[in-house]
Amino acid sequence: MTVIVPNYKTLDLTKLCLRSLRKYTDCSRIKVLVIDNDSCDESVEYLRTLEWITLVERKTTGEGGPEMHARALDMAMEMVDTELVLVIHTDTIMISDKWLDFLIGKINAAPDIAGVGSWKLEVVPPLKVFFKRIETFIRRLLGRKILDREHYFRSHCALYKSEAVRQTNGFYDNESAGVRMFAILRDKGYKLPFIESEELAGYMRHLNHATMILHPSSQSRKSSNPAKLRKLNKELEKLHAREILADDSLDK
């Protein structure tokens, strides 16, 4: 399996992601491709020191965030020579040494499965789900617009059969990474089962907006939300983030 990780200016988060991957993986079973999106900072300097990954540095002149991310994935796919390819974010953190066998088992469950993945890797409390449904019902009653996006595999965790990916236009197609690819594979008759958040969370976590925690200079409404910051800090504590960031041996 090849693991693709795009990087852009997130030193500590990139360290946490890659070190957790190293900590919970038999690296003789995977190849790790990190595509740096013209960071020109300490994060790419750090990546250059890692002998256990393959680092590709690309220029991103005129590219916005979503395009930059998707094009990085497409560049990486040109180098993939394994049967399976997993794409993750730098805020995807492994927490179990069984994650690899878990995902392989999912994608090999049937021959017509082209990929498995996640829409949102977050466990939502039942009460919050209940009130969200009430809110949606009321909005429909009042004739207000409801955002009803079609789900696809988001790139914080998406495992594909490499040959299936090559039957599409790739990750970049003027939309978020993987949107059109998911639709093309589905139209070709492939199965694309989603992994429930509650199940996937036993193997890895996706730290939504963690950049605002580890890189407090980022300016965003989310970074100024004390409740979300407290929640993320608690999650980082549960993942023993400080211990992992302090363990330089995981880079060797």
Regions found by a protein language model. Give the residues of each.
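Short, acidic, metal-binding catalytic loop of nucleotide-sugar glycosyltransferases
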Residues: 19-29
